[in-house]
Regions:
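A structural signal for multi-pass alpha-helical bundles of membrane permease subunits
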Residues: 4-296
Length: 296
């Protein structure tokens, strides 16, 4: 009798997994395989133009014929990912340390910090475009009161830092929540023992709290790195990929859907972006796992 119920339970488990597997297949596996296949063709999606298999010609074009453009996009991608990953985690860690303290309206400030995480990327991009626009934006107006021009917003020097800032602002809430959850798991007795030993608040945090939230650091660093390496929508809305913000995501989008619409070459860029993301994530995971073991 138990075998019958056990078999039914397993069947029920498999049935509940089917919808999720179908979604993963339709929106994960099939598009990924299709992109890989298209990267070996000269597909343009132009009606009447046949698609031909070209082998590694698209990849040769990127690494040989147009290496300078690919290199610039790769550098921009790594700069963007490094800036977002480092500062998003630093600010998130600081914010979580503050918001785990007991003070009036702490729940209000927690909600305020998390609010950007529920907004759409397009909404965030358009909102900050209006805020930072040099012609009539509120930031430009405030700077004009001090006799400072806001023309530097569109310069090569400031475009990337501003995009990094907006990306951090958009995702800081989620990062902070993960750190808050990690900090709340640290036993209060450990902090009390550190205080008795004469540890200051700063020393208490770095010597007691930080080593014990290493898993939270691993999660946040990997999510921030993976997310920023494949970001293109926010950059598209804010700068359209100009002023040194032409990341691999923007390079892929412009190649595939702008101008000649070379979907084959764009797919090749997408494959390389995916490979880069996998490599960076694996390296970070291996390093951070070692750090966790060393701290435990």
């Amino acid at each position: 009798m138990s075998n019958v119920f056990g078999g039914r339970q397993k069947s029920l488990i498999y049935l509940t997994m089917i919808p999720g597997l179908l979604v993963f297949l339709l929106f994960g596996i099939i598009p990924s395989v299709s992109t890989l296949v298209i990267s070996f063709t000269d597909y343009t999606a132009i009606p009447g133009v046949p698609m031909h298999f070209v082998g590694f010609a698209n990849y040769v074009h990127l690494f040989v014929n147009n290496f300078q453009g690919f290199k610039q996009s790769l550098v921009a991608t790594l700069e963007f990912a490094a800036g977002v990953t480092i500062f998003q985690n630093l600010f998130g860690l600081w914010m979580a340390n503050v918001l785990t303290k007991r003070f009036p309206a702490v729940n209000f400030f927690r909600t305020l910090v998390f609010m950007p995480a529920v907004l759409g990327v397009t909404v965030i991009g358009l909102m900050w475009s209006l805020i930072l626009t040099p012609s009539g934006g509120p930031v430009a107006y405030i700077l004009s009161l001090f006799g400072t021009s806001s023309a530097f917003f569109g310069s090569n020097t400031w475009a990337m830092p501003l995009v990094i800032f907006v990306q951090i602002w958009a995702n800081l809430g989620f990062t902070t929540v993960v750190y808050i959850a990690g900090i709340n798991t640290v036993p209060h007795e450990f902090h009390e023992a550190a205080k008795i030993d004469g540890a200051s608040g700063w020393t208490n945090f770095w010597k007691v709290t930080f080593p014990m939230i290493a898993p939270s650091v691993t999660v946040n660093v990997i999510l921030a790195a993976a997310g920023s390496l494949r970001t293109y929508d926010l950059i598209y809305v804010l700068t359209d990929g100009v002023h040194n913000t032409n990341t691999l995501g923007m390079y892929m989008f412009n190649t595939a859907f702008e101008g000649s619409g070379n979907l084959g070459l764009g797919a090749g860029i997408g494959v390389l972006q995916f490979v880069l993301t996998i490599i960076v994530v694996l390296v970070l995971q291996k390093y951070l796992n070692r750090r966790e073991e060393a701290m435990s």
